[in-house]
Design a protein with these regions (language model features):
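Ligand-binding "clamshell"
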Residues: 68, 84-97, 158-159, 192-203, ...
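Residue-level signal for the nucleotide or nucleotide-sugar donor/cofactor binding architecture
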Residues: 118, 170, 210, 235-240, ...
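Phosphate-coordinating loops and pocket residues in cytosolic domains that bind phosphorylated ligands
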Residues: 11, 64, 88, 125, ...
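N-terminal (or domain-start) structured segment
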Residues: 4-95, 132-133, 141, 145, ...
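Structural signal for conserved beta-strand scaffold positions within catalytic alpha/beta enzyme cores
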Residues: 49, 74, 98-101, 138, ...
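An extracytoplasmic/periplasmic, membrane-proximal ligand-sensing/linker region
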Residues: 11-13, 154-160, 238-297
Length: 297
């Protein structure tokens, strides 16, 4: 029996690769999950940041690793479900086994606190009445905020001009200076910047923001969220996957984990391995259609 016990997974530290810099949202969430799971697994979990090529470098480090459960990854949605429809990347969804989904944070349509609009309908009415007069910000052509805004305005029948920025901070600065009027980001930005939310880009309201209406309530079905799975290279043994899934689920149920997520204005959105894969595939298909529609000139 002792030989079997010695081989029991995990018997050495586990690495979680994050394809973005330390201190960013993905990194913080991965570290929280690593803390919680290491307690459940009674084993060290280390987060390794492998940055480059908009996430491709880190994700390739996961797909290139042995599928033994000792190399995992946490990534936001774009590199998995958006970038592959825009350019060649060295992986597909079939390159991974999904341990589970950590969270789903819908994007929010945001304007300056001083903006004249208090509802999405107010804003869209003005934008439709004055085509190409207003500007929306994005964190670059091809980013999730870019497609979210493009899709929203297309579905609402409004013509709004686009100004790309290098990231959230620059975009919100431009909103404060009224150089652009609208942007979309996740709930954390509501506290961080001088903005108000007009609508949640989802079909149902956020439990942390019960007073924020959804885009669906305005009749515009443009749904976008930032979501993160815990993934592994394809071919994870079933028992290893079960052990990891179990540890993940238990870690995410701990009050400490939930509280730490709430501090980032995020809510746990756990899905098990099977449901996570179905969710990611569905998002990918939807994004492919939107991208095709918007890229077709």
């Amino acid at each position: 029996g002792s030989a079997v016990a010695a081989d029991a997974f995990p018997n050495r530290p586990i690495t979680i690769v994050v394809p973005f810099a330390a201190g960013g949202e993905t990194d913080l969430v991965a570290r929280m999950l690593a803390d919680g799971m290491s307690k459940e697994l009674k084993q060290v979990m280390v987060v390794q940041n492998i940055v480059g090529a908009s996430g491709v470098a880190g994700i390739s480090a996961v797909t290139g690793a042995k599928p033994d459960g000792y190399t995992l990854g946490v990534t936001p949605s774009a590199p998995l479900a958006m970038h592959p429809h825009m350019r060649k990347v060295p992986y597909t969804l079939d390159s991974f086994d999904f341990v589970g989904r950590i969270l789903k944070a819908p994007y929010i349509v945001m304007v300056a606190k001083t903006a004249p609009w208090n509802t999405l309908d107010d804003m869209l009415r003005d934008m439709k009445a004055n085509p190409n007069t207003f500007f929306f910000a994005s964190s670059g052509v091809g980013s999730v905020p870019y497609f979210a805004m493009m899709d929203l305005f297309k579905k609402a029948g409004a013509q709004v001009r686009h100004v790309p920025f290098s990231g959230d901070a620059d975009a919100f600065q431009a909103i404060a200076g009224n150089r652009v009027q609208v942007y979309t980001s996740t709930a954390g930005s509501l506290d961080q910047y001088d903005v108000k939310g007009l609508a949640l880009m989802d079909a149902t309201r956020d439990p942390l923001l019960p007073n924020l209406p959804t885009v669906k309530e305005s009749g515009v079905e443009a749904y976008y969220s930032q979501w993160m799975p815990l993934l592994a290279p394809k071919g994870l043994p079933a028992d290893v996957k079960a052990t990891l899934s179990d540890a993940m689920r238990k870690a995410m149920q701990s009050p400490e984990f939930v509280e730490r997520l709430h501090k980032l204005n995020l809510v746990p959105g756990y899905l098990d391995s099977k449901d996570c894969r179905a969710f990611v595939e569905e998002e990918s298909v939807r994004n492919a259609e939107v991208i095709k529609g918007l890229m077709a000139k």
